[in-house]
Amino acid sequence: MSKRYFVTGTDTEVGKTVASCALLQAAKAAGYRTAGYKPVASGSEKTPEGLRNSDALALQRNSSLQLDYATVNPYTFAEPTSPHIISAQEGRPIESLVMSAGLRALEQQADWVLVEGAGGWFTPLSDTFTFADWVTQEQLPVILVVGVKLGCINHAMLTAQVIQHAGLTLAGWVANDVTPPGKRHAEYMTTLTRMIPAPLLGEIPWLAENPENAATGKYINLALL
């Protein structure tokens, strides 16, 4: 049976994709057949092949399997806004059955599947359904990405607590340095490590340019999962 993990973040723009690429690289190095999955993405660009989302493309590149774009990202929207808003505006409902079918298809091909969410934990997919609902439905172990900056401790603890209250496994967390480390960086890391009830899988240093394309798998200790 495939190993499956869901990557969420303490907020949008905290480095979920950077961490997801690092995790995929580490899993590939460990000998797994890996697949990244971004079931819903907004903020995509028009290309000759159709809409393409940069996060989904990064997952596609960092998967060890050769996957079609639509397999990695079945729901793609142009406007960078909450999926439930643009989905309703375009008359394209996001269906959990389609999301789950995509996951099943990847599980048939890969033995290590990483699913990346959109935004934070409770990102709405419709007026009545959130990403959290789908993850709970699928019973996916969760990896939390924390963008290390002022305010991250509270956001990390709130997210970790609600994940556990949903009855899900918080499998681990990844620290992502979204800015050059400040003078309190070490204290933030010490506090987060003490308070988050899951192992620290690794810390990805601040990378000024194209972090999704960097060799970041070396920062991840996959043995802790």
Swiss-Prot record:
GO terms for cellular component: cytosol. Its EC number is 6.3.3.3. Changing N176A: Increases affinity for CTP 3-fold, no change for ATP. Changing K38 to L/Q/R: Complete loss of activity. It catalyses: (7R,8S)-7,8-diammoniononanoate + CO2 + ATP = (4R,5S)-dethiobiotin + ADP + phosphate + 3 H(+). Homodimer. NCBIfam families: bioD (TIGR00347). This is ATP-dependent dethiobiotin synthetase BioD 1. The lineage of its organism: Bacteria, Pseudomonadati, Pseudomonadota, Gammaproteobacteria, Enterobacterales.
